[in-house]
Every structure is written in structure tokens, then in C-alpha cells.
UniProtKB/Swiss-Prot annotation:
It catalyses: (1S,2R)-1-C-(indol-3-yl)glycerol 3-phosphate + L-serine = D-glyceraldehyde 3-phosphate + L-tryptophan + H2O. The lineage of its organism: Bacteria, Bacillati, Bacillota, Bacilli, Bacillales. The gene is trpA. This is Tryptophan synthase alpha chain. Belongs to the TrpA family. It is an enzyme of class 4 (lyase). GO terms for molecular function: tryptophan synthase activity.
Length: 241
């Protein structure tokens, strides 16, 4: 069964080329991080490239413009990971309209709790962009069932009680939790945070519908040549097929 490959890239000066590379390597959905000065959910690797992107003058408008201009060349769906402050500053309606124009499939807003996500959805019933739900391992069953029921696009389960990309084992209850969440939703459930290797992927997709890989891919785009990165992406894609 085909599982979803959801790689993450930081929206920096050359992010659009990275998005195209990921798309060609078989990404189902590419997650594009919007650089932000206080990224509470990001580990050191992503924080560093985010700071660099801010210094390069990258902002949300640059990301929208690049996606709008290049959307016909990108086969994968793509979502933005952004903090609510950026949306609020831009104006919710204007932001959602810009997303639609740029072909954005969904938004992940890590600092917006479920109740506020639901209010945001209710304020914009006409929007075409999905608001993607996050569920952490610390979330109670009752609450995670509610989030799962309300979800659209896909659900992003946080596999570790930590920020992204830190080493460590997956939560022992993780697979059971993912199966439980899947039983309460119509949308795919993908797992992310701390996934790096083909072995990690193989382990987690016993329960999940796919994986999000962030820090590892960001690091490879920063440090490796393109061909080495493509080989890595293919290994992950093969495990997911």
C-alpha cells in the first residue's frame, strides 16, 4: 500500500528548487516552513536555516510569489507550516486568498490550539485551503478523538514529546495511539518529529499512513550535493511504496 511521503523544507531563497527536487523524488505533500523569529516548535537545525532565511530577506510574500509562479511545475501537493502571528499580520482572509492563488493545499499552524483552529475554520467557510491538525502524544484520548473527527486534509501526529529532529526512540504507545486516532477520522494520519532513517520509517508506517521528515532533509539540502540528497529521498520513497 502506498504510504505518504511528506518532506519538509524551509522557505529560503532557493526553496522552490528544493520543492521541485522533492516533488520529482516522489513526495506526496511537501511541507514548506515559513521563517519566523520565534519558532517554538522547531529544533536547532530548522531554527538555524529559518534565521538564515530571515537574514536573506525571505518573508511570506516571497514564498507566495514563488509558489504562484511555479505551481504548474510542482506535481506534489504542498502545505505551509506557519505561526499564527504571520497569518494575523497579513490578514486572515487575504492570507487564505493568497494560499488559494498559490495552490497551497493546507496550513499547519503549530501555535494554534484546536479550539482556535475550529474558530478559524468557522470564520472562513468558503476557503479551499485545508487547516491541518496536529496531535501530540500528550493529548488526552477524548481530545485527540475530537481533533481527529474535525480534521481535514491529513493529521500530523507528533511522535515524540520534544521539538523536531532530536534523536530518541519513538513513544512506546505511539503505534497504538496512531491506530486509535485513525479509527476516529476519515483523513490520513502521518507521523513526524524525530524521523530520520529508512529504519525509522519502516517502523512507524506499521501504524501510520505516512511520515513527515524535517530536520534530516533540511540538513541534507544544506550540506550534501543534490545527487546524494536525491539518493536518500529515493530510499525513503522505496520504503513507503
Amino acid at each position: 500500500m502506498h504510504k505518504l511521503f511528506v518532506p519538509y523544507v524551509m522557505g529560503n531563497r532557493d526553496f522552490i528548487e528544493n520543492v521541485k527536487t522533492l516533488s520529482e523524488a516522489g513526495a506526496d505533500i511537501v511541507e514548506v516552513g515559513v521563517p519566523f523569529s520565534d519558532p517554538v516548535a522547531d529544533g536547532p537545525v530548522i531554527m538555524n536555516v529559518g534565521n538564515k532565511a530571515i537574514q536573506e530577506g525571505v518573508n511570506i510574500q516571497y514564498i507566495f510569489d514563488q509558489l504562484t509562479e511555479n505551481q504548474d511545475e510542482i506535481q506534489s501537493k504542498y502545505v505551509l507550516m506557519t505561526y499564527y502571528n504571520i497569518i494575523n499580520h497579513y490578514g486572515e482572509l487575504a492570507f487564505l486568498n493568497a494560499c488559494e492563488q498559490a495552490g497551497v493545499y493546507g496550513l499547519i499552524i503549530p501555535d494554534l490550539p484546536h479550539e482556535l483552529v475550529q474558530q478559524l475554520k468557522a470564520r472562513h467557510p468558503e476557503r479551499k485551503t485545508n487547516i491541518i491538525s496536529l496531535i501530540a502524544m500528550t493529548t488526552s484520548n477524548t481530545r485527540s478523538h475530537q481533533i481527529a473527527k474535525d480534521a481535514e486534509g491529513f493529521i500530523y501526529t507528533v511522535t515524540m514529546n520534544a521539538t523536531t529532529g532530536e534523536d530518541g526512540k519513538f513513544h512506546p504507545e505511539l503505534k497504538n495511539r496512531i491506530k486509535d486516532i485513525k479509527a476516529h477520522t476519515e483523513v490520513p494520519v502521518v507521523a513526524g518529529f524525530g524521523i530520520r532513517t529508512a529504519a525509522h520509517v519502516k517502523d512507524i508506517i506499521e501504524a501510520s499512513d505516512g511520515v513527515v521528515i524535517g530536520s534530516e532533509i533540511v540538513k541534507r539540502f544544506e550540506n550534501d550535493d543534490k545527487q546524494t540528497t536525491i539518493e536518500y529521498l529515493k530510499t525513503i520513497r522505496n520504503v513507503l511504496n
